[in-house]
Amino acid sequence: MTITEKILARESGARLISPGDNIWVNAGMLLTHDVCGPGTIGIFHREFGKDAKVFDTEKIVILPDHYIYTADEKAHRNVDTLRAFAKEQKLPYFYDPGTASYCGVCHVALPELGHVRPGETIFGTDSHTCTHGALGAFSTGI
């Protein structure tokens, strides 16, 4: 098996997988930012209920990095939505712009902060999420 197949097999509990197989995998880490995060949060609440809780607070990283330094108040609403969700869910990995915890572009910051580990699965709401495959993870945008 390829490294991708090995990672996906392990994360799905299968001994062996092949191209074309349909599998369910355990997510090692989920990423979102200020572009897709608010919509994702809306879907989360719509599908699971207003009082729903995330499955594992340690596996969710929210890092706004697209519209953070702009005069557009609508763009600021996106970060406000992320901030409120992180507080509501008690997410430890919300990197808030303008605070000491902020760390820049998500795809650079994730490995620097230890959120990317070889052999894990990473799903992010950004097409560049796949760059973390260079560090030995299975990583893709959704």
Label for each model-derived stretch:
Residues 1-142:
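Fe-S-dependent hydro-lyases/dehydratases of central metabolism
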